[in-house]
Amino acid sequence: MEIIYKICMVIELLQLSVNNGYDEYNMLQNIEKSENGFTNEVKGMPFDEYKQWLKKEDDYSKSQNLPDNWIPQTTFFLNIDGIPVGIGRVRHYSSEYLEQNGVGNLGYGIAKPYRGKGYGNILFENLLIKCKLLGYKRIKLFPYINNISTNKIMLKHGAKLLGTINDEKHIYEIEI
């Protein structure tokens, strides 16, 4: 019997594009509409509407067609060996309104088939780099207290607990 070891993987954090297709769409079907505070509008959406959603999200990254009180944000897909496994968003700056409502500077989700493989940690690390490139010195995050995996990832990256919101969300700050 021949044993083959995989010694490396190709990790890519790719900015959402209007040209994204079925691979990303299918991955998004494996993340709930609202799970642990992360919103996935694409769950259950027909593919033709998904293409319109891509355009809307691309516009948001360019500060175009934003709803009132929204901050520009860029959406990224995490690909491992060419396969989309997760999605993340980075807001271009912070606001008092978002913080008062427990909305952090970044958010992410990993598709169910790919959980428990360390991809959440990889995605989070790469989103922190994007935050730094946007000029953040520190970010605030508001994970649900019962979201054990995300809390562990944030603490691993130096999150300092500042408090809680209504006994359901932690308030963390990370210096980057």
Language-model-detected regions and their locations in the chain:
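Conserved catalytic-core motifs of GNAT/GCN5-like acyltransferases
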Residues: 142, 155-174
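Conserved acetyl-CoA-binding loop-helix of GNAT-fold acetyltransferases
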Residues: 108-110, 116-129, 152-156
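Loop/helix-junction capping segments adjacent to catalytic residues or to phosphate/diphosphate-binding pockets
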Residues: 21, 117, 148
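GNAT-family acyltransferases
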Residues: 2-105, 166-176
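Conserved beta-strand-loop-alpha-helix junction that forms the acyl-donor binding cleft
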Residues: 141-151
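Conserved GNAT acetyl-CoA-binding A-motif
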Residues: 133-142
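Short coil/turn motifs at secondary-structure junctions
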Residues: 93-95, 113, 146
